[in-house]
Amino acid sequence: MRKALTAALILVLTAAASAGLGQQKAPDPLERLARLYEESRYFELRDAVARMKDHSSLEMEFFRGAVDEVFNLLDSAVSRLQNYVHSAEKGPARMMTKEAWVLLADAFRRSGRYREAAEARREILDRFGSVLGKEEKDNCENQVGLWSALADIPPQEVEVGEDMTIRMTNRQFPVRVKGRTFFVGHDTGSNLSILYKSIADELDVAIYGPAIKIQTGTGQWIDGRTGVVPEMRLGSIIIRNAVFLVLPDEFFPSAAARFGVDRRGLLGAPVLEGFKEITETKDGDLIIPASPRPRFEQNMCFSGFMPVVQVLFRGARLSLCLDTGSSATYLYPPFFRRYRGEIVSRSKPRKSTMGGVGSSVTVPIHVLDEFGFRAGGKDLSLRKIAVHTEVTHTDTRYFHGTLGLDILAQCSRMTLNFESMSFILE
């Protein structure tokens, strides 16, 4: 649906300029903003919007709201986007209005305003259902069911009373619920935290709503149930009203063998964002400060709950997802298309099997001998990097790749600050 945004905006601009037919006009900068948005080039969009601070059109209210939403200024985003949809109800730019509702739904979800998230998704179905593709419509209906079921659940709260340094065992650490201690990992690539069904049953976790479908990193769709844990403790940190996706244990058959501990779940992006800042060290510590200090480089944003970081490659600005659940860095079709000639001339096509939650998939790839880039303030060089040539899931359609934990081999620590939206490597 994003591909219709530029066309919709051009119709608006054409109508507005109809009195000037026959006169040659300079390209309208709003068209560039629309292209940056639909291509998920959020860092360039932010900078372009900032340069248009004196522009006061209704369309600018949409783009300012979009920038606020992806850079985690949720109160401002909601205000701007609500102003846009209310003002544009009778306007012609229907695809922009639809995108505004998508961003509003996401802002409500990340704020823990689940009832409003469901209402925004329902608005999309009611107003635009006839023009949605099947996958997008199914996903929207799925989210209406999910957030409607959680409508009466209070927003998640995280209480960090003191600086915490947690010694991990193979990147797993103990949490406590109802007096029961078990191990979990952490995964910024997971839109919801995860509990295995066995521990959810043991803890009598309350389940809300019907089964929902989620898309895994391999592009496969799996069924899960939604549960809420009223209180979980990580050392002295208290996590309240955390939403978990409850999945069958058989989706994680090798957890104990891989990690050497009895892992029963994952803390996903909503809980990690609630910590405000996390630092993972090469030596295996997870550091969570009580009061994160301000950071000055805004080089990270959100796509949904997925952190996206800015990467410099040969002077070009790329956007890569940051997935702490991925052991390796991958490059995706947008990168392949941009550098196709060079990649094809230097490597032969091959197949690779990717594992994910509950499934695996074989994908066509090329392999780069070396990928040198700058991220988080540090120059990095990775060898034998797979370049996916076909789209397998949503992130592979819009972003240049995924940064995995192999970058930690060249750093002492990695910090994600969700207040300043900063990604820092040291």
What are the roles of these predicted feature ranges?
Residues 1-4:
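Positively charged n-region of N-terminal signal peptides that target proteins for export
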Residues 7-16:
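Bacterial N-terminal signal peptides
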Residues 20-426:
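Pepsin/retropepsin-fold aspartyl endopeptidases
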